[in-house]
Each structure stands twice: as structure tokens, then as C-alpha cells.
Amino acid sequence: MLIRKGGYMQKFTVDRKRAENAFRNYTMKYDASDEKVRLKIEHTFRVSELCGKIAASEGQPESAVDLAWVMGILHDVGRFEQLRRYGTFVDALSVDHAQLGADILFGDTQDEWKRREGSIHSDTGCAQRRNTKGMIGDFLNDSSEDALIETAIRSHNLLCIDPAMSDRTRFFCNVLRDADKVDILKVNVDFAPEDIYNTTAYELRHCRVSEEVMQSFDSDHAIMRKLRKTPADFIVGIISLAYELVFQYSREEVAKQGYLGELCRFRSEDPVTQKQFEHIQAHMQDYMKTAPGVGEEKNG
């Protein structure tokens, strides 16, 4: 456990209906008939539910579960504006969606957030006057956890989170990151590659996994974005997210849902790629049997 059971220190209040309505009102500005928009709306609600369940599985009280839940509602706000501006969800081809979302919600920039004292290095340095340029007030009346929420949103898509974080901040960041990873596996099975990446099903099934990505996969860590060159590399990158799951509930949910196994069983028209995925499937099956224990984070 990153924080002791029952160790949530202050009462935080969330009106879930208000937060849901604010999210729906915000996304009404975008075309919900677009599969890409629908994808992210549905993803958001599933991640928020998973966040609450993960926090509850770690023995946290209702106020902490609510805090985790609302982080899920807020975590991908930037995706919709990213899609409108750039026509893609690929951060490397557009903008960092996590930073954009936090900017929209909190009305400041990443540099301003970094300068703010106490945002990630303390359990108590959270209270900040809200920037009225942001829209976080549409979702939440209680501002006592704004800094923690902003930190979690800005950190949810990073390869690694800041080691200087307090245990409490790290706990909530890991809850959000786990929930997001669990549902990303589902999204990559349920939606066509055209709706997620700048590629087609044909391209995906007729390319190979690059050697760098194969080597990285065997190191049992998530694959860095800069290594991904081919459409198949992106699928392997998604599979590799399972290496970074922190909580036992998350691993159990992945096993129950079955999407990780389905991605590992990807069928390619290229015989070399097919052999690569057979190796990926066997390696991931072995890893999941011996994954770190409950709440443990890997070193290295």
C-alpha cells in the first residue's frame, strides 16, 4: 500500500451528477456522431468507474473513492480539443493531451504548474486559489484537491511519474494511470485503428514490429513512444502498458476482461510479424503469472 488503509486525511466532497453533467455539457461542443469523439466519451466514463473501484479495493473511504472517480471524469478533457485542432489522438503529431486538458481545466500552463509550491512534494500543500480562466469550477465546487487533481491529470500519460511525489499523491496518480491503462486495452480491441491512430487495418496487418520495439518489450517495461515507428509498434506499445500496472485489482480486471490476450493474439498477414506476436503472447503470459505483488511498483 502506498498509503495506509483509512489514511485519507481530509473530507473531500464530490457531486457526481454535477461532474457528469459538466462533462456532458463540455463534450456537446464536439460531434458525438464522430467515432473518435464517442470513443473518448465512453472511455472517460469507464475510466472513472475503474478509478473508484481501484481506490475502494485498496481500502480507501468514500471521500477518497469519490476523488479517484472524479479524476477519471477529468483525465481526458484535452482529447476533444486535441481532435478538433489536429484531427488526431497521436500526441507526437499534435499536442500533449494531458497538458492541454489540465490547461483547459485549471487555466494555467504546465510551466506555471511546475512553479507552484507544494503541488506534488507535499500532502498538505494543496490549497490554491482557483484561476477563474479554467473550467474546473463547472465540475467541482470543492477546490481543496485541485492541485492533486491537476498533478494526476498532467501525469497520467507519462512513461514514469515524478519520484519526488508524496506517497498520497503517488497513490492517486497510480490509481488513475492504472484505470486508464486497463481501459485502453479495451478501446484498442473495440475500435478500428483508423479511429485511434493515423493508419488503416490493411497497413496494420502488413507491417512488422521494429527490432527496437521487440527488444524493449522483452525488458518488461512500457515502450517509449519515440521507439514506435510502424503501426504494429503501436499495438505492441499498448500491450506493454500491462507491465506498468501497480494494483492487484487492475491485473485481475485485465485478466477478467480478456482484451490483453486478444491484442496479443493479433493476426498479421506478414509471417515474420506473426512470429513476433507469438513471442509477445508467450512472454506476456509468463509475465502476468509473476507480476509484482499488490500495490508494488517496479524498480528500474
Give the ranges of each region predicted by the language model:
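Acidic/His-rich, divalent-metal-binding segments that scaffold phosphate/diphosphate chemistry
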Residues: 5-99, 125-128, 132, 166
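Divalent metal-dependent phosphate-bond-processing catalytic cores, especially two-metal-ion Mg2+/Mn2+ enzymes
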Residues: 10-12, 36-45, 49-61, 74, ...
